[in-house]
């Protein structure tokens, strides 16, 4: 059964690895007209499949695919008045179209290791995320699928599918991102780093 679950369109049909020095592009909501338009002036980094309950997922998919760009590389270039924050209490302020519900970007305004990075979904571009954007690098928050109703017995099969696609999968973020979070927290707390224990 898990082999037939739709993971995400950028995973189910094979992973595109993108183009070096991809310059970015435009992302759009799903409205038929007067679309919200986001312009990105860089490629994404840390593009990954996310199983958390907060990220926007295409209809029928159990994962989102989300990457980050520097906040300075993102601008709303059309129909900004259609955007609203989904949950003002969440660390990531997810801006969604009030009409179609698609999340266009997430921004962190509070002190946080990822402040200065915006979270985006490259499949919202005209090429569906395959025209040059960084490919999916790993899968995070896989166990979170259970809390959203996925039968726990299916999760091992989901993990096997992810591995067959060449994706390591975690129940948090990838080790380099977890190290970045720990480093940020340690610096904030005044920890002095030493070269040996």
Curated annotation (Swiss-Prot):
Species of origin: Emericella nidulans (strain FGSC A4 / ATCC 38163 / CBS 112.46 / NRRL 194 / M139)
Annotated positions binding Zn(2+) 2: 50, 52, 55
Keywords: Lyase, Metal-binding, Zinc
Gene3D superfamilies given in the database record: glutathione-dependent formaldehyde- activating enzyme (gfa) (3.90.1590.10)
Cofactor(s) needed: Zn(2+)
Protein name per UniProt: Putative glutathione-dependent formaldehyde-activating enzyme
Broad EC category: lyase
Annotated residues for binding of Zn(2+) 1: 29, 31, 97, 100
Pathway: One-carbon metabolism; formaldehyde degradation; formate from formaldehyde (glutathione route): step 1/3
């Amino acid at each position: 059964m898990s082999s037939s679950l739709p993971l995400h369109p950028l995973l189910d049909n094979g992973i595109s690895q993108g183009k070096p020095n991809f310059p970015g592009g435009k992302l759009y909501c799903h409205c038929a007209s007067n679309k919200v338009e986001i312009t990105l002036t860089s490629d994404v980094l840390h593009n990954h499949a996310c199983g958390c309950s907060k990220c926007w997922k295409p209809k029928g998919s159990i994962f989102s695919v989300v990457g980050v760009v520097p906040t300075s590389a993102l601008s709303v270039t059309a129909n900004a008045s259609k955007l609203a924050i989904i949950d003002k209490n969440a660390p990531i302020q997810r801006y969604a179209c009030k009409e179609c519900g698609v999340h266009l970007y997430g921004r962190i305004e509070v002190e946080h290791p990822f402040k200065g990075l915006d979270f985006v979904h490259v499949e919202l571009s005209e090429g569906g995320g395959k025209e040059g954007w960084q490919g999916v690098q790993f899968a995070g928050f896989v166990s979170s699928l259970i809390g959203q109703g996925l039968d726990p017995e299916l999760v091992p099969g989901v993990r096997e599918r992810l591995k067959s696609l060449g994706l390591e999968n975690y129940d948090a973020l990838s080790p380099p991102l977890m190290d970045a979070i720990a480093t940020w927290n340690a610096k904030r707390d005044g920890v002095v780093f030493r070269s040996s224990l």
